[in-house]
From Swiss-Prot:
First and last residues of every Pumilio repeat: 92-127, 128-163, 188-223, 286-326, 334-368, 369-407, 511-548, 549-587
Subunit structure: Component of the 90S pre-ribosome. Component of the pre-40S ribosome.
Cystines in this chain: none
TM annotation in the entry: none
Species assigned in the record: Saccharomyces cerevisiae (strain ATCC 204508 / S288c)
Protein name as catalogued: Nucleolar protein 9
Length: 666
């Protein structure tokens, strides 16, 4: 008898009871209910700190606006002049620091000043915020100033740690280390940690503090994948042209006290979320559900991801991981419902993708085995959610499990690429990592998608880069789009993956009208694809000649272009053993010497092509070419003597001509 489907009202009620559906306000309500865990004083004042410190008068505002413009222009003749100017700003700002950092206009000035000031001035600014760090971290503009301040402070902590006599450089007065000042600030923030975790601005500050305390890389504040700032903040920072100094994008050594503080912060948060439970068995299901709601909250989720990443430094039990997920070998209905939500929600899938990368392998294997193994293809088809989790599994599971995933997913790859091109990269990397597992099948699927044999109009530049719908050839000076960058990088990965894609790409380029290919050379993104196919040892000599026939006609204009000049640099090597083409390009550049040398890009091409040597000592230039050819093709055979038959014929003809000459003279 077949398995009957369970039905009935009781079963439906049980399903509804186990179903995970976060309430949009539940996390915030949870904060308000449990804020008293940290501080028994008025809760409203804590969650909404008083942040008005007055306003600058008109003259002060005008001075600081002008100072900000001057720093932005950065037209100082010497570093000393710039430092004196920064010092004068700091002197003028004394007593007004809080007004400055809470203003949209002048907060940018404070960031610039913090980036340029010396260590003593940095400490003075840091101390001016004592008592209001929490309030500033919750402020839209001041929170950015704090982030910049904390990164520079972390660099100073390391410097003091590694330089025992550092205090000799300090001015008169009591010496306070940056470490002690940092610890004092952390004590001020501890009563508000839970509020900060779910606060729009303070959550970024908290994440940065965790990175500093755990000695992780402090990322660049403008990079797209930076964990330091929100997407809007990174865009705004680029627009106002605030550049990070050398203290960013580094890992800093920290004192032991920082590790203790990290343990204290994470332990405090854990006790707050579990109501001080002594063991996991004392934690109620409702508490676990509420914390899971935090895990899928778009503000709190990145903080929890980071906590799970660093908690292993001192907590072997991985308490936060075990608060989110079970560790038993059996399925749990509530956990299953939660996993299903994670795999179908954008925030949830991003959370799961990140924690998989930092969790113990046995925990990841458990989740995969219980909840994902039997439906991996279905998850891969969820291009905005589950596909990211599958990619993370391919990176972190053991060889056996990765091969199982590849067995299931590779036959569907050409279809999956329709909506998720990055998935192709993950498959290629996983296949390579497993010694080229299913390599031929992967290549076949990729060719089926981008260069189908049965198609008469096949062109990988159209199918992969979507040239017809791109910004190529636009006269409006449109910036290349992020989608175009993503597609170009993927095609470059395919070119590196196998020679078939290199040859397919070259064939597609040669199939384009010449004008279209030249337009690609001047495009901010597609020029990289042209540059990438110019691989001397991988491209056969016939195709090299066909490409050079087109590119050499445009050599002067390419040399004077920001993107085309890189292609010209590659042609220096690409013309190896094709001396005729190399000389043709060199001659064209020399004929337009003035135009080339008047261009900053042209001068670099002139240098890389050794054209001064070409003009002054042609034979030395040709000798250099021969050396280059031998370096690129060390195993190439020298010119062979002609066969013996031809040699005899030549000798006979010589003897015959000599006999005729002798007869003539007689």
């Amino acid at each position: 008898m077949g398995k009957t489907k369970t039905r009935g009202r009781r079963h439906q009620d049980k399903q509804r009871k186990d179903e995970f559906e976060p309430s949009s306000n539940s996390a915030k309500e949870h904060i308000q209910q449990e804020e008293s865990t940290y501080n028994d004083e008025a809760e409203i004042k804590e969650t909404q700190p008083q942040m008005f410190f007055g306003v600058l008068d008109r003259e002060e505002l005008e001075y600081f606006k002008q100072a900000e413009s001057t720093l932005q222009l950065d037209a100082f003749e010497a570093p000393e002049e710039k430092f004196q100017f920064v010092t004068s700003i700091i002197e003028e700002a004394k007593g007004k620091e809080l007004k400055l950092v809470t203003s949209q206009i002048t907060s940018k000035l404070m960031e610039r000043v913090i980036l340029e000031c010396d260590e003593t001035q940095l400490k003075d600014i840091f101390q001016s915020f004592n008592g209001v760090f929490f309030g500033l971290s919750c402020h839209k503009y001041a929170s950015h100033v704090l982030e910049t301040l904390f990164v520079r402070s972390a660099a100073l902590v390391e410097r003091e740690l590694l330089t025992p006599s550092f205090d000799n450089n300090e001015k008169e007065g009591p010496y306070v280390t940056m470490e002690n000042m940092f610890l004092f600030m952390l004590n001020e923030l501890k009563p508000h940690l839970k509020t900060m975790m779910n606060h729009q601005y303070a959550s970024h500050v908290l994440r940065l503090l965790i990175l500093i305390l755990s000695s992780k890389t402090l990322p660049n504040s403008t990079k797209a994948n930076s964990t330091l700032r929100s997407k809007k903040s990174k865009i705004a920072r680029k627009m106002i042209d605030i550049k990070d100094n050398d203290d960013f994008n580094k890992v800093y050594q920290t004192p032991e006290s920082f590790k203790s503080e990290l343990r204290d912060i994470i332990t405090t948060l854990y006790k707050g979320f579990t109501n001080g439970a002594e063991s996991r068995s004392d934690i109620s299901q409702s508490t676990i559900t509420k914390f899971r709601e935090y895990s899928v909250d778009k503000v709190a989720s990145p903080v929890i991801q980071l906590i799970i990443q660093v908690e292993g430094i001192f907590d072997r039990d991985r308490s936060f991981w075990r608060l989110v997920f079970n560790t038993a070998d059996e399925k749990d209905p509530k956990e299953e419902s939660f996993l299903e939500y994670l795999l179908s929600d954008p925030v949830g899938s991003h959370f799961l993708e990140n924690v998989i990368g930092s969790a113990r392998l046995k925990y990841v294997e458990r989740l995969y085995r219980l909840y994902m193994k039997d439906r991996i293809v279905k998850l891969a088809k969820r291009d905005t959610t589950g596909a990211f989790v599958v990619r993370a599994l391919l990176e972190h599971l053991k060889e056996k499990d990765v091969k199982q995933i590849l067995d299931a997913v590779v036959p569907e790859l050409s279809m999956l690429l329709n909506s998720n091109m990055d998935f192709g990269t993950a498959i290629i990397n996983a296949s390579n990592k497993q010694g080229g597992y299913l390599r031929d099948d992967v290549i076949a699927q990729l060719i089926q998608k981008y260069y189908p044999e049965k198609s008469d109009a096949k062109n990988i530049l159209e199918s992969c880069l979507l040239l017809s719908a791109s910004t190529l050839g636009n006269t409006r000076d449109d910036w290349p789009t992020a989608e175009e960058r993503r597609r170009s990088v993927f095609l470059e990965q395919l070119i590196d993956y196998d020679d078939k894609f290199l040859n397919i790409t070259i064939d597609s380029m040669l199939a384009l009208p010449e004008e279209r290919l030249i337009q690609m050379c001047y495009h901010g993104v597609f020029s990289h694809v042209v540059e990438h196919v110019l691989q001397t040892t991988r491209v056969d000599i016939i195709k090299r000649k066909m490409l050079l026939n087109i590119l050499s006609k445009e050599s002067v204009n390419l040399a004077c272009n920001v993107y085309g000049s890189h292609i010209m640099d590659k042609l220096w090597e690409f013309t190896a053993k094709l001396t005729l083409y190399k000389e043709r390009i060199a001659r064209a550049l020399v004929l337009e010497t003035e135009k080339v040398k008047n261009s900053i890009y042209g001068r670099q091409v002139w240098k890389n092509w050794k054209l001064e040597l070409y003009v002054r000592k042609m034979w030395d230039w040709k000798k250099l070419i021969k050396e280059q050819e031998f370096e690129i093709f060390p195993n190439s055979k020298p010119l062979q003597p002609k066969p013996e038959k031809h040699s005899r014929e030549r000798n006979n003809s010589k003897e015959g001509s000599a006999f005729k000459k002798q007869k003539h003279y007689r």
